[in-house]
Amino acid sequence: MDKLADLNYTLSVITLMNDTLHSIIQDPGMAYFPYIASVLTVLFALHKASIPTMKIALKTSKCSYKVIKYCMVTIINTLLKLAGYKEQVTTKDEIEQQMDRIVKEMRRQPRMIDKLTTREIEQVELLKRIHDKLVTRPVDVIDMSKEFNQKNIKTLDEWESGKNPYEPSEVTASM
């Protein structure tokens, strides 16, 4: 276990791989050598990182199948990212979780639309009432029937003997 986590051991293995590749490929004009070396280095680092992780996970976990599946999916996704792919490998559990999340969101959307629609209708009704109160209407004839001081006034035709009782009359006084 100490050998797996030892940085010097890892660097010596990488140097050994590079020396081996240099001895195999004698052509100094080889253009793809740095890419091949970097891919092999990454694969070796993944190998060295994943084996201790999987050993620890298998010892501590009760459900080893899920752990192995998760580790494999993670390694494959890492390799796909390194290769430049945007797609990822997912497990059935992840797909089911995403589908559940999407279904919950789809159920939530109509409720939100209903709430927003109700609020918008209420706002439109309120704006209509405010508009109706603010609109000035042209007045041709003033209706005085509702005025307080006009309730008991009689017209000239309604007065007894056709005489206005409020008109001053001539008063003569003795001296």
Swiss-Prot record:
Topological category with respect to the lipid bilayer: Single-pass type III membrane protein
UniProt feature coiled coil, ranges: none
Lumenal side: 1-28
Positions with a binding annotation for Ca(2+): 120, 123
GO cellular component, one term: host caveola
Residue spans, topological domain Cytoplasmic: 52-175
Transmembrane segments: 29-51
Molecular function GO labels: channel activity; metal ion binding; toxin activity
Function: Plays an essential role in the virus replication cycle by acting as a viroporin. Creates a pore in the host endoplasmic reticulum and as a consequence releases Ca(2+) in the cytoplasm of infected cell. In turn, high levels of cytoplasmic calcium trigger membrane trafficking and transport of viral ER-associated proteins to viroplasms, sites of viral genome replication and immature particle assembly.
HAMAP family reported for this sequence: ROTA_NSP4
Subunit (UniProt): Homotetramer. Interacts with the immature particle in the viroplasm. Interacts with host CAV1, early and late in infection. Interacts with host integrin ITGA1/ITGB1 heterodimer. Interacts with host integrin ITGA2/ITGB1 heterodimer. Interaction with microtubules blocks trafficking to the Golgi apparatus.
Name of the protein described by the UniProt record: Non-structural glycoprotein 4
Source organism of this protein record: Rotavirus A (strain RVA/Pig/Mexico/YM/1983/G11P9[7]) (RV-A)
